[in-house]
């Protein structure tokens, strides 16, 4: 690595809206406030909802499926 071209990379305190606090390194340089973290995000907590994408796709196909069909 070249000398004197890299930005300052200090440790910063990160605070989540759920109250979880941890430290990481960032070029931002100040304390960070975030909305979600691994302690409160639904994917990590196991409280994830499964969306019914199959039903939504079928509803779209029913409404617009024949839109591009050529008439005989």
Curated annotation (Swiss-Prot):
Pfam families: Ribosomal_L31. Binds the 23S rRNA. SUPFAM superfamilies: L28p-like (SSF143800). Keywords: Metal-binding, Ribonucleoprotein, Ribosomal protein, RNA-binding, rRNA-binding, Zinc. GO terms for cellular component: ribonucleoprotein complex; ribosome. Part of the 50S ribosomal subunit. This is Large ribosomal subunit protein bL31. Binds 1 zinc ion per subunit. Its cofactor is Zn(2+). The keyword Aminoacyl-tRNA synthetase does not apply. It comes from Pseudomonas fluorescens (strain Pf0-1). The keyword Ribosomal protein applies. PANTHER family: 50S RIBOSOMAL PROTEIN L31, CHLOROPLASTIC (PTHR33280), LARGE RIBOSOMAL SUBUNIT PROTEIN BL31A (PTHR33280:SF6).
């Amino acid at each position: 690595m070249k000398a004197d071209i890299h930005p300052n990379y200090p440790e910063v305190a990160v605070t989540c809206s759920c109250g979880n606090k941890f430290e990481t390194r960032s070029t931002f340089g100040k304390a960070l406030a975030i909305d979600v973290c691994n302690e409160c995000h639904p994917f990590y907590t196991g409280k994830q909802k499964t969306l019914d994408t199959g039903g939504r796709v079928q509803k779209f196909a029913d409404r617009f499926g024949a839109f591009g069909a050529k008439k005989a």
